[in-house]
Curated annotation (Swiss-Prot):
The gene is rpsP. Belongs to the bacterial ribosomal protein bS16 family. HAMAP family: Ribosomal_bS16 (MF_00385). Residues 118-130 have a biased composition (Acidic residues). Residues 99-110 have a biased composition (Basic and acidic residues). This is Small ribosomal subunit protein bS16. Residues 82-130 are annotated as: Disordered. Keywords: Ribonucleoprotein, Ribosomal protein. GO terms for cellular component: cytoplasm; small ribosomal subunit.
Amino acid sequence: MAMKIRLARGGSKKRPFYRIVAADSRMPRDGRFIEKLGTYNPLLPKDSEDRVKMDLERVQYWLGEGAKPTDRVARMLEAAEVLPKTERNNPKKAVPGKKAQDRAEEKAAKAAEASEAPADEAPAEEAAAE
């Protein structure tokens, strides 16, 4: 049986509330689960202690049994220092787009030309007469 530790949505429309549950991966998101492991209330402020509550002993038990946490639950477990932090990398986000790269190259070329030209054509400044 493939086990998952995931969020099951509760609450009403526009007022989400989630249970952190251990469930068979084939069951529906809000359907039957094996054990409730905690709660997550996204409406509370991020620094609130009540935002995420988990029974860490039971979470570690289910991880030992082979349950795989979903991405969101894995981040919560990393914050609780149950799982080691995984390095996330998005290198393409830092690279500017093609047009921006072209503009930067043109600007660099103009700056190079401008720095060469004024050295030759710069007129000598005359001393101000008093």
